[in-house]
Amino acid sequence: MENLETPVRILVVDDEPDIRNILHILLSSRGYEVDEAENGLRAVECVRAQPDYDLIILDIMMPGMDGVAACTEIRQHSVAPILFLTAKAQPADMSDAYG
């Protein structure tokens, strides 16, 4: 019998290629369909083109458009859950992420 379920689609956004690669390997090995973006602007472009992601993993600290600005733009096109990935750990950083 053919599996009619569509795979879960995840967008991984990070300016560090090694981080994107690790997440891609881990997630795709578990059956997730993974797209990658190297910065916030590219993430927004991906979501505009395909707003039906099931999850977006978004780095906060990126050159150009950071993760917080990208999140604001993404929210205009998608209701996908966004998981922030960051090395920042201060309470003010969490406040910034939640807007």
Please provide the spans of the model-predicted regions.
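Non-catalytic signal-transmission and effector/linker regions of two-component phosphorelay proteins
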Residues: 1-11
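Active-site residues of response regulator receiver
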Residues: 14, 59, 86
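Two-component/phosphorelay signaling modules centered on CheY-like receiver
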Residues: 17-35
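Residue preferences within the helical output face of two-component receiver
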Residues: 43, 74, 96-98
